[in-house]
Amino acid sequence: PLAFGGLALLDRLLAGASARQRLGRGFVVGLALFIPTISWITQLTFPGYLVATLVFAVFLGVVALAVPPHDGRRVALVGAWVLGESLRSAWPFGGVPLSLLAVGQVAGPLATVARVGGVLLIGLATVAVGTALSALFTAERRAAAVALGAAVLLLVLSIVAPQGDPTGETIDIAYVQGGGPQGTR
């Protein structure tokens, strides 16, 4: 999926960048991520869409700022991204888990990782693959092997992890979705 290439590009953008550059580049990547993926908010409120897009883009800028430009950059990018997604899933308003990396892996190769560690572990594995691609482009084969190995290990663990047994019990669930006029326009 495109997430791997996008994260490899983000890693390259952060390499050797000053704090101001990392913040700015993270912000621009945030705009590129959130402008299309939360555009549905315009159906509710266009000003709210603009505010949400800017707030989440700044959030990603801060994540990029937390990543050091040299030593440990790739490991820090993985950790900062997962921390950022975790915080976005809890704040503001009790959590706004929009545009998480796991959404792009629903039918992707890392989807089974959710059984072991949920959406955050999918995010971790996705960023690890992205940083592995980045390392390959710069001929850092050892770093690429470590990052890709970590992602593959998570994938293998998720495949061999126990799935549980059906209990034979059933429950009835009711789900109601509104769809009438809401006075939002």
Could you tell me what each predicted segment is?
Residues P1-G164, G183:
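Membrane-embedded alpha-helical bundles of multi-pass enzymes
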Residues A161-R185:
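Soluble catalytic regions of membrane-associated enzymes that act on cell-envelope
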